[in-house]
Amino acid sequence: IRKQPHVGVAFFFDGACEEGVVHESMNLASSMKLPMLFVVENNLFSSHLDIHLRQPGNRVARFAEAHAIATEVVDGNDVLAVADAAARLVARARRGDGPGFIEAVTYRWLGHVGADANIDVGVRRSVREVALWKKRDPIARLEVALSTERGIEPAQFGNIRGRVENIVE
């Protein structure tokens, strides 16, 4: 609208895709070719229910596709894959080609409320399932990628972690 290089970004979870306001927002963004990036963290649970109990499929990118929005489905536990997808879709939005949508597929390690590893209303996940996802820890995977692909020495990660913790506090 203002013809500036800015791109609006909205982060939300898979359960929000079941709300009308999300579809209204995507429809408006697509119709007006707004420079917008929708980022959905699909952790496979909405509040207390597995996605398979709420939807006919486990991917939510189909909702954006219905609004003619460019979509990318990525491994949400791969920080670099998410960053690469965001860079592509932001560049597209800045060119005036309309909004983009990232579905970052990940997993919620803990319950919706509190620190219980199980879902809060009696749904129990197997220990094996949770353990498999924990092996895909995005921070540990990023450290491996940065050391093998970007040449960052493993000894530097302690300093990086400390700086990040200071920023977060």
Placement of each model-derived feature along the sequence:
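Glycine-rich ThDP/TPP pyrophosphate-binding loop and its adjacent helix/strand module
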Residues: 1-168
